[in-house]
């Protein structure tokens, strides 16, 4: 299974980009959740505006779908400057980054998604750009080649990554503001679903929004995706109104259970408990048993299961907790610690 094909994947789908832009809040006051980050950003942005300076460079990290791109757009909007967007894999050569940087206006925001995937050559260009607002470029080839310095306008780099551990120390140290985005609470997701339903012109009651929010794995992108699928169900099998009962029917049909787990989550838990006695089991062994790539389990499936207390990651491997046994309706073996 391709990770982006999962209904409960936090990764963006290409066809969702237009829809996401339509429901994306423009101001910090409209942004739901991440209260600590919002409070900090509000102060930093106001201070930068008062000093008429570029905002410090910002690093946002955390699981996919939590609003890193949305926050970058909000920061640019609140600063009243332009936003240029790109991603690590697209910036293949140093010249690609140099072209972007030299076209920035003063105090503009440059947003680089998946910044951990920058090549070393591109990263080298970024260091002096971030520190001194300068870049070195080579003119000519061979013995006649020479390096010249180009001054850049002051700008703010916002880097986003789902794998902060892969960032090099020199790059990480150049960010003045760094924040880990957390999974959202149920009440925050309910607010997001209610807001999106209004923008989609979908009839929904609070209990229906709560049911969708409860199964959204703490992730706004998943909440909005589930809302659209439940809307389809409501229009075909119901009267267009999303209630708790209808949301429950729709999501059960879509195989997203009351905890937001799908078939892949259940398969991983079942393999760990039934095939390996609850562990400890190595991630490579689990990946083969589940039939998925190690990276998919490690970066996408595991974090939510760990956060919900169903799996523990130990030096000897993955271990199923008592919650996992209860969820699968399997008796915990005697003498096994939770």
From Swiss-Prot:
Q: Which GO terms describe its cellular component?
A: cytoplasm; Holliday junction resolvase complex
In the record, biological process GO terms are: DNA recombination; DNA repair
Question: Principal place where this protein is found?
Answer: cytoplasm
- The record's EC number reads 3.6.4.-
Which keywords describe this protein according to UniProt?
ATP-binding, Cytoplasm, DNA damage, DNA recombination, DNA repair, DNA-binding, Hydrolase, Nucleotide-binding
SUPFAM superfamilies annotated for this entry?
A: P-loop containing nucleoside triphosphate hydrolases (SSF52540), Winged helix' DNA-binding domain (SSF46785)
Large ATPase domain (RuvB-L): region residues: 4-184
EC category: hydrolase
Please give the NCBIfam families that the UniProt record associates with this protein.
Answer: PRK00080.1, ruvB
- This chain belongs to the protein called Holliday junction branch migration complex subunit RuvB
Q: Which organism is it from?
A: Dichelobacter nodosus (strain VCS1703A)
């Amino acid at each position: 299974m391709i990770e982006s094909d999962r209904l409960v994947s936090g990764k963006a789908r290409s066809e969702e980009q237009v829809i996401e832009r339509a429901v994306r809040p423009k101001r910090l006051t409209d942004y739901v959740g991440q209260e600590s980050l919002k409070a900090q950003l509000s102060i930093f942005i106001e201070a930068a505006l008062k000093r008429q300076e570029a905002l410090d460079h910002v690093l946002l990290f955390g699981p996919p779908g939590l609003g890193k791109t949305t926050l970058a757009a909000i920061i640019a909007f609140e600063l009243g400057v332009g936003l240029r967007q790109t991603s690590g894999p697209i910036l293949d050569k140093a010249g690609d980054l140099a072209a972007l940087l030299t076209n920035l206006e003063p105090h503009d925001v440059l947003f680089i998604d998946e910044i951990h995937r920058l090549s070393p050559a591109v990263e080298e260009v970024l260091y002096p750009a971030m520190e001194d607002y300068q870049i070195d470029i080579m003119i000519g080839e061979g013995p006649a080649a020479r390096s010249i310095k180009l001054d850049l306008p002051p700008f703010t780099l916002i880097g986003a990554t789902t794998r902060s551990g892969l960032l090099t120390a020199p790059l990480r140290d150049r960010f003045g503001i760094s924040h880990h985005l957390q999974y959202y609470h149920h009440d925050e997701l309910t607010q997001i679903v209610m807001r999106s339903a209004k923008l989609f012109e979908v009839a929904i009651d609070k209990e229906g929004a709560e049911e969708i929010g409860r199964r959204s794995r703490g992730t706004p992108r998943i909440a909005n995706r589930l809302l659209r699928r439940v809307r389809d169900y409501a229009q075909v099998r119901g009267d267009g109104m999303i209630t708790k009962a209808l949301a429950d029917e729709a999501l059960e049909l879509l195989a997203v259970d009351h905890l937001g787990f799908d078939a892949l989550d259940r398969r991983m838990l079942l393999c760990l408990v039934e095939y390996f006695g609850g562990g400890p089991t190595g991630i490579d062994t689990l990946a083969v048993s589940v039939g998925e790539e190690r990276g998919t389990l490690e970066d996408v499936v595991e974090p939510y299961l760990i956060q919900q207390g169903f799996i523990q990651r130990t030096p000897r491997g993955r271990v199923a907790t008592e919650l996992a046994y209860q969820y699968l309706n399997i008796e915990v073996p005697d003498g096994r610690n939770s």
